[in-house]
């Protein structure tokens, strides 16, 4: 719709608003006592036929035939037809009904019947205006197809695209089901700080803010991990948090700077237990919310039936490339092998960083059905417990579905001396320009020095899980109000 045309339509509606007020009608009404939703009437027609009902909603379509008019109104449950006739409403009220616009929100009283065409309808005896719409909705045959506009004006998107509403209803059910599952397993939901004096718990660039009263720099949290593990030190044995993380990074179909994570920690467990609970949790959610473990994502069938494949990173790389990096521990030789494979690596990278880059380039995109990739290098896992039998590797896994990371977990490092040494190595990386390397967190080291029980920890990206289970191509399609660059 052209800007000038839109302005003209808004002008006409403002004039109607003025007319209503001159008539003594308040176009922004108060409470309206509904007896039913649209869906309740449609589902219970036999019990409600000829009964009086009161419903409210937004006018989505309207057509008139002289002294009678039909309209469709929409509430959160769906749409239902209403029928207005001059004989029942009276001349003045019917004229007012005729002047209603698509987008107006009204409350109606009437009896339930079925038209000659068989459509369940409410025959109006009265109505009232609850909110006058001053802007026209997108024309129904076009809908709201401008993707960027859909994100900027999500409120309009939700009005005109019922499938978008359904996605966010499913999101709510998914999160609720996760909470119920963990609560039944004996986990305690907790809340940890959103503003941290030290950014930690993940390799990411933080958002920085300033606390005026304390005159100190603070970081929006990139992960709650180090606070949740402090709770293990304090004696809590099974904790979880579902909340927002913030990372000052690029935006893509898989990344939004503000996103929702589930993190859980279980004392006296390890990464095998975390694999088990991840499988059980995601399959439980899929069965409860979707009713199936065989889903289709972006046209690709995915089988969620257990057990899921588990494969060491080095073995996955060897199967994909033919190169056994377990026998190429020298970083210079590993660098040369990676270059031969066409993997973008940089001189000076360590062995663990190189094989991780090879994995991400050559293996990750091929992992369509759920796959746990286990035993990550210690260089890229500064918070994971080192393997006794192979100290270059850790007891860590990531879960991949459709070539995307869905979860990250490990047997937690609880040795304060080892943890401090790894933090120091991360500081060296920061000094060389790696803004995502961990900062030193002395208080966390102090906590570990009091003794933290061995534990398994798990993080699942809620947004990516919702994308998978609702078949949405972009993370923005599962976040109600994704971050957008302001318009000029």
Curated annotation (Swiss-Prot):
**Could you tell me one molecular function GO term of this UniProt entry?**
magnesium ion binding
Q: Which UniProt keywords apply?
A: Aminoacyl-tRNA synthetase, ATP-binding, Cytoplasm, Ligase, Magnesium, Metal-binding, Nucleotide-binding, Protein biosynthesis
Main localization of the protein described in the UniProt heading: cytoplasm
Signal sequence span is: none
- Where does this protein hold Mg(2+) 2? 405
Tell me the compartments it is located in. Cytoplasm
**Alphabetized Pfam families for the sequence:** tRNA-synt_2, tRNA_anti-codon
Spell out the PROSITE patterns in the cross-references.
AA_TRNA_LIGASE_II
CDD domains with a match to the protein in the record? LysRS_core, LysRS_N
As to how many cofactors bind and how, the note says: Binds 3 Mg(2+) ions per subunit.
InterPro entries referenced in this protein's UniProt entry, alphabetically: Aa-tRNA-synt_II (IPR004364), aa-tRNA-synth_II (IPR006195), aa-tRNA-synth_II/BPL/LPL (IPR045864), Lys-tRNA-ligase_II (IPR002313), Lys-tRNA-ligase_II_bac/euk (IPR034762), Lys-tRNA-ligase_II_N (IPR044136), Lys-tRNA-synth_II_C (IPR018149), NA-bd_OB-fold (IPR012340)
Which EC class is this protein assigned?
Answer: ligase
Q: What is its EC number?
A: 6.1.1.6
For biological process, the GO terms are: lysyl-tRNA aminoacylation
Q: Which GO cellular component terms, listed alphabetically, does the Swiss-Prot or TrEMBL entry include? A: cytosol
Quickly give the catalysed reaction.
Answer: tRNA(Lys) + L-lysine + ATP = L-lysyl-tRNA(Lys) + AMP + diphosphate
Where along this sequence does the record place binding of Mg(2+) 1?
398, 405
The Swiss-Prot or TrEMBL record lists the needed cofactor(s) as: Mg(2+)
| Quaternary structure annotation from Swiss-Prot or TrEMBL | Homodimer.
**How is this protein named in the record?**
Lysine--tRNA ligase
């Amino acid at each position: 719709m052209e800007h000038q045309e839109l302005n003209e339509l808004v002008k006409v509606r403002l004039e109607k608003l003025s007319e209503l007020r001159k008539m003594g009608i308040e176009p922004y009404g108060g409470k309206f006592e509904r007896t039913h939703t649209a869906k309740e009437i449609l589902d219970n027609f036999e019990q409600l036929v000829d009964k009086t009902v009161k419903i409210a909603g937004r006018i989505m379509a309207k057509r008139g035939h002289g002294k009678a008019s039909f309209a469709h109104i929409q509430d959160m449950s769906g749409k239902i037809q209403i029928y207005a006739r001059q004989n029942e409403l009276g001349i003045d009220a019917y004229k007012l009904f005729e002047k209603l616009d698509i987008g107006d929100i009204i409350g109606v009283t009437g009896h339930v019947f079925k038209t000659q065409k068989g459509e369940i309808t409410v025959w109006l005896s009265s109505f009232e205006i609850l909110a006058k719409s001053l802007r026209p909705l997108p024309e129904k045959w076009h809908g709201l197809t401008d993707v960027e506009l859909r994100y900027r004006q999500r409120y309009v998107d939700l009005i005109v695209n019922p499938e978008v509403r359904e996605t966010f209803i499913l999101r709510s059910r998914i999160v609720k089901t996760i909470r119920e599952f963990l609560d039944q397993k004996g986990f305690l939901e907790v809340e940890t700080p959103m503003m941290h004096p030290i950014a930690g718990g993940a390799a990411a660039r933080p958002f920085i803010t300033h606390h005026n009263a304390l005159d100190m720099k603070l970081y929006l949290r990139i992960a709650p991990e180090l606070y949740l593990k402090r709770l293990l030190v304090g004696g809590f044995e099974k904790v979880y948090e579902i909340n927002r993380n913030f990372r000052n990074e690029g935006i893509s179909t898989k990344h939004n700077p503000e996103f929702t994570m589930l993190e859980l920690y279980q004392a006296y467990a390890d990464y095998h237990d975390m694999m088990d609970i991840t499988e059980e949790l995601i399959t439980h959610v899929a069965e409860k919310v979707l009713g199936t473990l065989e889903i289709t994502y972006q046209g690709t069938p995915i089988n969620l039936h257990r057990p899921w494949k588990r494969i060491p990173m080095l073995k996955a790389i060897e199967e994909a490339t033919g190169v056994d990096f377990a026998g190429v521990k020298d970083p210079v030789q590993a660098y040369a092998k990676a270059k031969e494979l066409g993997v973008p690596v940089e001189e000076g990278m360590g062995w663990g960083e190189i094989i991780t880059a090879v994995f991400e380039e050559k293996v990750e995109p091929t992992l369509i059905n759920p796959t746990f990739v286990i035993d990550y290098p210690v260089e890229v896992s500064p918070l994971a417990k080192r393997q006794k039998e192979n100290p270059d590797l850790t007891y860590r896994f990531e879960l991949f579905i459709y070539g995307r990371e869905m979860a990250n977990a490990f047997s937690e490092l609880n040795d304060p001396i080892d943890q401090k040494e790894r933090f120091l190595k991360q500081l060296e990386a920061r000094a060389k320009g790696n803004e995502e390397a961990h900062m030193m967190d002395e208080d966390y080291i102090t906590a570990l020095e009091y003794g933290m029980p061995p534990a398994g920890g798990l993080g699942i990206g809620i947004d990516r899980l919702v994308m998978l289970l609702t078949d949405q191509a972009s993370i923005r399609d599962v976040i109600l109000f994704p971050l957008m660059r302001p318009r000029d």
